[in-house]
Amino acid sequence: MKFDTVIMGGGLAGLLCGLQLQQHGLRCAIVTRGQSALHFSSGSLDLLSALPDGQPVTDITAGLDALRRQAPEHPYSRLGAQKVLTLAQQAQTLLNASGAQLYGDVQQAHQRVTPLGTLRSTWLSSPEVPVWPLSAQRICVVGVSGLLDFQAHLAAASLRQRDLNVETAEIDLPELDVLRDNPTEFRAVNIARLLDNEEKWPLLYDALSPIATNCDMIIMPACFGLANDTLWRWLNERLPCALTLLPTLPPSVLGIRLHNQLQRQFVRQGGIWMPGDEVKKVTCRRGTVSEIWTRNHADIPLRPRFAVLASGSFFSSGLVAEREGIREPILGLDVQQTATRAEWYQQHFFDPQPWQQFGVVTDDAFRPSLAGNTVENLYAIGSVLAGFDPIAEGCGGGVCAVSALQAAHHIAERAGEQQ
């Protein structure tokens, strides 16, 4: 099977790269083993929240300039501030075109409220998520009886420290009792599958309506809206106060929705989606990828002109830790890591951890190297890249988006030259 590009990994980076390549008229396939990290994320995307020295970032342009001085090997530093901002804006346009109408500005970070009621600097958020400063003084944090994925009293306690009048309440929907037989089934995603049925909408409205008359804003867990935000908008039009949603413990309704919107758009535009498959071997000839062998296609290889590695980091098994060191399991690419295992981590759990910055070694075009030699038609994007800490620096989503579009533009340019 011949393709212009085969992407190994179907997470945020892989999907955005595929969508951008389709804009250039290239035929793409995505091989994906299972659920991506988006299923376990908040659904919000960070661009740059803090510098390596811990200084918070609000002005993104100034932050990118400072980042280049502090971390010259960071993926952003390799591209330059203006290029990063341009690609981030293109990514936001691509997300909106896929149906993910996210709120945010590439020039200026905003503060979103987290499930614990604290504030986190971010780039893009779902419109349902409350953004600081809140537009209300009287707030009610509403939990769902029996839902362990969200603790209303914890969020309320944090918000009270910001001089807000915050109460808590709990709604009990007997219609959800079918899920209560097994506590492991009473999760936000399963509740959403039930509440998203239009016939159930009035039940949720009836439960929230008495609470809404006594406050200016309701904050509740994101336990509906798995396909779109239609129910949220329907409730906001009818309730006498604003309704906002906070992501829950994973799996996350907002994260799954974002992934599904991107995946459906990729397929709509003619992309080949290969779920439940796994790349077992990649054949390289004369420094280029010639064939990709997958578990489901056995002896029928995929033959791409270009290949993209978007396999993620440790969480997605894009990187594997062993006693001897860190390795990239598909091709055995060169990996940037510390000299000894003892240097992988810091003693204090909440300190920035060195292993977070491990990843494949690439050139400035994000082409990785194998035994010191660049693989000419292979690009590495997203969390598999080295040189950044997605947690401490708050840049995971941004690196995925920016590197994906950079690789896509580079591939499109080279594909045009080869025609």
Swiss-Prot record:
GO biological process, one term: glycerol catabolic process
One protein family per Pfam: FAD_binding_2
Pathway in which this enzyme or protein is active: Polyol metabolism; glycerol degradation via glycerol kinase pathway; glycerone phosphate from sn-glycerol 3-phosphate (anaerobic route): step 1/1
Annotated EC: 1.1.5.3
Record-level Gene Ontology MF annotations: glycerol-3-phosphate dehydrogenase (quinone) activity
Cofactor: FMN
Catalytic reactions on record: a quinone + sn-glycerol 3-phosphate = dihydroxyacetone phosphate + a quinol
UniProtKB keywords: Flavoprotein, FMN, Oxidoreductase
GO cellular component: glycerol-3-phosphate dehydrogenase (FAD) complex
Keyword Oxidoreductase applies: yes
Origin superkingdom: Bacteria
Protein role: Conversion of glycerol 3-phosphate to dihydroxyacetone. Uses fumarate or nitrate as electron acceptor.
Family that this chain belongs to: Belongs to the anaerobic G-3-P dehydrogenase subunit B family.
UniProt cross-references to HAMAP family, sorted A to Z: Glycerol3P_GlpB
Quaternary organization: Composed of a catalytic GlpA/B dimer and of membrane bound GlpC.
Cross-referenced NCBIfam families: glycerol3P_GlpB, PRK05329.1-1, PRK05329.1-2, PRK05329.1-3, PRK05329.1-4
Name of the protein described by the UniProt record: Anaerobic glycerol-3-phosphate dehydrogenase subunit B
Source organism: Salmonella schwarzengrund (strain CVM19633)
Recorded name of the encoding gene: glpB
